[in-house]
């Protein structure tokens, strides 16, 4: 069974989507429509901007979303998944590709999400760190140990066995990284991200995004969407909306999502969007399935 998966922030690169824009009339129309909705020419930054411009949250999120969604929509009849999932931001891409959300509404929501998250990052500076080589339970335990009332760190992204991303206040992340390394982590490295995504520090962004999501019409998707907050398949529009709101302050349960998709019959995963991050994760979750980019 075919599954399509959609990457999140961090997969962006300057030049992304340019081939699509130059060689596909439908893609060009959709990119131009997005420029219009966003109120600035995001394609200029995507195709020939600087890394610094592209890594601003308010730019990165719409850029990755557009590259992913437009890649899927331009496949036409070849886009026929039995199920879909997206990693963090990629969940919005998956919902548009699966027809739960219209393209224009998706662009508006991804812009609202990015702006709300950037504001939350500026109000409560935080960061994230990738931890390699310790069991999830041990990492969770250390996060709890080093957290205090005003200085928290939580498990944010369960990416694949042996790789977990933690998120929180800068001091708490640094303290956790020291302790994790002392306790045997192969690596505990702070990431170059704008803030503490998928942690309680995103609460103001969640409240802001909730209004935008509730004001948007969602439809039943053409296939089940495995959502980050519970790693379960969803087709009910109200459930999808609630999970999308909860996602900003909840962990991304990617390992469990992929495992559950495989249990449901998925054996051929196509990553739709920039980079190969999800292909690598899927390979580490289960070596018996196929994971590739768009062929």
Each model region followed by its residue ranges:
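FabD-like malonyl-/acyl-CoA
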Residues: 1-139, 191, 268-295
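Alpha/beta catalytic cores of group-transfer enzymes, especially the acyltransferase/condensing modules
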Residues: 9-11, 38, 98-249
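Non-catalytic positions within long, well-ordered alpha-helices that form the structural scaffold/packing
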Residues: 181, 262-265
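A short, well-structured juxtamembrane/interface segment
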Residues: 252-260
């Amino acid at each position: 069974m075919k599954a399509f998966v959609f990457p999140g922030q961090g997969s962006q690169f300057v030049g992304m989507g340019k081939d699509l824009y130059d060689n596909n009339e439908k893609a060009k129309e959709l990119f131009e429509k997005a420029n219009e909705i966003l109120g600035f020419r995001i394609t200029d930054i995507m195709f020939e901007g600087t890394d610094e411009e592209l890594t601003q949250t308010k730019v990165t999120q719409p850029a990755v979303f557009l590259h992913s969604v437009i890649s899927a929509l331009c496949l036409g009849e070849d886009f026929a998944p039995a199920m879909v999932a997206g990693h963090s931001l990629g969940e919005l891409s998956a919902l548009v590709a699966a027809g739960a959300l219209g393209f224009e509404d998706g662009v508006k929501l991804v812009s609202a999400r990015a702006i709300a998250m950037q504001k939350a990052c500026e109000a409560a500076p935080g960061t994230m760190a990738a931890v390699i080589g310790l069991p999830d339970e041990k990492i969770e335990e250390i996060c709890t140990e080093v957290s205090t009332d005003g200085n928290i760190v939580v498990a944010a992204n369960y990416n694949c066995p042996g790789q977990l991303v933690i998120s929180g206040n800068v001091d708490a992340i640094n303290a956790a990284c020291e302790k994790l390394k002392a306790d045997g982590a192969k690596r505990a490295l702070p990431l170059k991200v704008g803030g503490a995504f998928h942690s309680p520090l995103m609460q103001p962004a969640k409240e802001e995004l909730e209004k935008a999501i509730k004001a948007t019409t969602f439809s039943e998707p053409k296939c089940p969407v495995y959502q980050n907050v519970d790693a379960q398949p969803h087709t009910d529009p109200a459930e999808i909306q609630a999970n999308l709101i909860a996602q900003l302050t909840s962990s991304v349960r990617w390992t469990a999502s992929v495992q559950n998709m495989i249990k449901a019959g998925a054996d051929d995963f196509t990553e739709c969007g920039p980079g190969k991050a999800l292909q690598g994760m899927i390979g580490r979750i289960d070596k018996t399935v196929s994971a590739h980019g768009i062929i």
